[in-house]
Amino acid sequence: MKKPIVAVIAGGYSGEHSVSLKSAAGILSWLGSEPFSTFLVLIERDRWSVRVSEQREVPLDKNDFSFDLDGERIRFDYAYITIHGTPGENGLLQGYLDMIGIPYNTGDTLVESLTFNKYVCNRFLSGFGIRIADSMRLTGRDTQPDVADLIARMGLPLFVKPNVGGSSIATTKVVEAAQLLPAIEQAFSEGEEVMIERLICGTEVTCGAFLRKKEVVALPVTEVVAHNEFFDFDAKYNGAVEEITPARISDEATRLIQTMTARIYELLNARGIIRVDYIIEADGIPTLLEVNTTPGMTPTSFIPQQVRAAGMDMKEVLCTIIRDGLNETQ
């Protein structure tokens, strides 16, 4: 029987391009050559290509998601999206794949566009009783807000960050009024909307989840102890953080985080692997920070740590997701 041909899609148009390539390398190493034939698909603004060997790339035909290899026309059976940012995390790529009938590992266009907008996603989930931080959104019309009015409403300290995007790029902790406008300008440099969020104090944790045989599996919880003021890009990717899996929290708190994560997965009708970040405040109740539907997948990322702590391996988890996706289309 012919092996299914799987595209591991990486790259994208955002500042997280390099992170995406590292995640793709991790996924390809775990999948290996069995039970699927896997290829790296690189998406750039001016070119979509397939890496068929270390030294060779060939163009990808966007009409049917296929490519020519030595005279043979090869069409992908499945797409594993590991783009962090646009177009893989905001629903654009999902819409394209839906139109040409290629199954994939994430939520659909609606789910991805919702979760990519931090402010809107958190507001949506708060309607189901999920606690969120006090926040506000600025659009392109609000590039010079009244600082005094904003601080009177939100207080200090607070966080300023792009409303879409990830990896804590252009995120600033603001502790005094003079820092606010520069922080807003920096966040606007990465996108058209800015989210301002009240500082939450407590223990930062994160929990992954995936679907196995139509049941949501919540993974062990990781505690995040940043050596910087907060878990910024440097902490995430340059080692300025301590990541403890399982987290040093009570069994009751662990169960609560896992239950909330599974519920968020179901409320969003998510697919594949997601990761949800929280702060456990002094009252023991978790406050939602954000939902990530294409989490980092390098060997040292949170999800692989949690999978190992659960006694599973990444190949097993990835193959489960891909097989389930292929079976749904048969």
From Swiss-Prot:
InterPro entries recorded: ATP-grasp (IPR011761), ATP_grasp_subdomain_1 (IPR013815), D-Ala_lig_Van_CS (IPR000291), D_ala_D_ala (IPR005905), Dala_Dala_lig_C (IPR011095), Dala_Dala_lig_N (IPR011127), PreATP-grasp_dom_sf (IPR016185)
Name the positions where ATP binds.
151-206
Q: Which reaction does it catalyse?
A: 2 D-alanine + ATP = D-alanyl-D-alanine + ADP + phosphate + H(+)
Give the residues the record marks as binding Mg(2+) 2: 290, 292
Give start-end of the signal peptide.
none
The entry's Mg(2+) 1-binding residues are 277, 290
Q: Which residues form the ATP-grasp domain?
A: 122-323
| HAMAP family cross-referenced by the UniProt entry | Dala_Dala_lig
Show the Pfam families listed in the entry. Answer: Dala_Dala_lig_C (PF07478), Dala_Dala_lig_N (PF01820)
EC numbers for this chain? 6.3.2.4
The Swiss-Prot or TrEMBL record describes its family as follows: Belongs to the D-alanine--D-alanine ligase family.
Q: How is the cofactor bound?
A: Binds 2 magnesium or manganese ions per subunit.
Name where it's found: Cytoplasm
UniProt KW keywords: ATP-binding, Cell shape, Cell wall biogenesis/degradation, Cytoplasm, Ligase, Magnesium, Manganese, Metal-binding, Nucleotide-binding, Peptidoglycan synthesis
Cross-referenced SUPFAM superfamilies? Glutathione synthetase ATP-binding domain-like (SSF56059), PreATP-grasp domain (SSF52440)
Please state the pathway this protein functions in, per its UniProt record. Answer: Cell wall biogenesis; peptidoglycan biosynthesis
Organism lineage: Bacteria, Pseudomonadati, Bacteroidota, Bacteroidia, Bacteroidales
GO CC, sorted alphabetically, is: cytoplasm
Chief localisation class: cytoplasm
Tell me which species this is from: Porphyromonas gingivalis (strain ATCC BAA-308 / W83)
Gene Ontology molecular function: any one = metal ion binding
Q: Which Gene3D superfamilies match?
A: 3.40.50.20, ATP-grasp fold, A domain, ATP-grasp fold, B domain
Q: Kindly provide the name given to this protein in its UniProt entry.
A: D-alanine--D-alanine ligase
What is the annotated role of this protein in its UniProt record? Cell wall formation.
Cofactors demanded by this protein: Mg(2+); Mn(2+)
Annotated GO biological process? cell wall organization; peptidoglycan biosynthetic process; regulation of cell shape
Query: Is Magnesium given among the entry's keywords?
Result: yes
